[in-house]
Amino acid sequence: MLKSRHKMREAIFKSLFQWDFNKEEILEEISKEHIVSLEPNLQELAVNYLKGIRENIDVIDEIISKYLKNWTLERLSVTDRNILRLGTYELIYVDDIPIEVTLDEMIELGKTYGTENSGKFVNGVLDKIAKAEAPKEKFEL
């Protein structure tokens, strides 16, 4: 299941990455090509994640911006920006995923798709967000 969830996060990231270039496209439509190979229950979960991210994008971006030091969201690479969006969504809005799992998964996405510094950068920003913004119950998972 863990490897399957990793594939799901990867599909969500790829959908967000593509959507970032053309916000006129419907995110859920873009995602179809990326989530088709997932198990049916994970396809549904991926769609829920994407819907949640789209509906809360302004709040998510505001939270990320608050914890960027010497950067703006717009100056980040498309890769780092969308990994941070996915990670922030999971930290704030998904109750049953432990913080450490989210951080580890986002670091891996950063290492796979970003620059040599993406993993460390993503970890630093998401760690600050987790400590300050994540629901307290998540620290007990």
From Swiss-Prot:
Share an example GO biological-process annotation for this protein: transcription antitermination
Please name the SUPFAM superfamilies in this protein's record: NusB-like
Which cysteines share a disulfide bond?
Answer: none
The source's superkingdom equals Bacteria
* Keyword Methyltransferase belongs to the record: no
Recite the UniProt keywords alphabetically. RNA-binding, Transcription, Transcription antitermination, Transcription regulation
Q: Which GO terms describe its molecular function?
A: RNA binding
Task: Name residues in a coiled coil.
Answer: none
Q: Name one GO cellular component term.
A: cytosol
Asked if the Swiss-Prot or TrEMBL record annotates the protein with the keyword Membrane, the reply is no
| Family according to the record | Belongs to the NusB family.
Q: Function, please? A: Involved in transcription antitermination. Required for transcription of ribosomal RNA (rRNA) genes. Binds specifically to the boxA antiterminator sequence of the ribosomal RNA (rrn) operons.
- NCBIfam families for the chain: nusB (TIGR01951)
**Under what name is this protein listed?**
Transcription antitermination protein NusB
Q: Which organism is it from?
A: Thermosipho melanesiensis (strain DSM 12029 / CIP 104789 / BI429)
